[in-house]
A protein has these predicted regions:
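Buried hydrophobic packing segments
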Residues: 11, 38-42, 101
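Active-site neighborhoods of divalent-metal-dependent phosphate/nucleic-acid chemistry enzymes
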Residues: 68-115
């Protein structure tokens, strides 16, 4: 099994798959922020009319079914995320929490965000869902 830090975009990608079996080959790790970001993104998709309520709630329940270890040492994580956001010139620290956790665990970040991937590839390893199973 491959350990990875999963960001919210990658989590949503896996949850939308008819068969999220690629996730079963991964040891998924994430900051606790992941759950709130996924909840918010699903709610926004419903609010915009892009996804039916039932589908969003199903994906939210599927999140509970994914075996994700959420890391709670927020003091250490937040300090590292703050430093990363400063280093990369980011005003917000949301993405920096995922990057910080990947650094702390010395594992790659799984993301669908190409801009994020390009911005942090000099700091950590980065994978896209298409890289799984290769």
């Amino acid at each position: 099994m491959t350990p990875v830090v999963l960001d919210a975009g990658a989590a949503l990608h896996l949850l939308a798959l008819p068969d999220p079996s690629p996730a079963s080959e991964l040891m998924l790790r994430a900051p606790r922020l992941l759950r709130s970001e996924v909840l918010s993104a699903l709610h926004a998709q419903v609010w915009r009319g892009a996804v039916p309520v039932d589908a969003a709630l199903t994906m939210l329940r599927r999140l509970d079914g994914l075996s994700i270890t959420l890391f709670a040492d927020e003091h250490l994580l937040h300090e590292r995320a703050w430093a990363i956001a400063d280093q990369l010139g980011w005003a917000k620290t949301y993405d920096a929490e995922y990057v910080a956790l990947a650094q702390l665990l010395d594992v790659p970040l799984l993301t669908v965000d190409g801009r994020l991937a390009r911005g942090v590839e000099r700091l950590i390893g980065v994978l896209a869902p298409a890289d799984l199973g290769r």
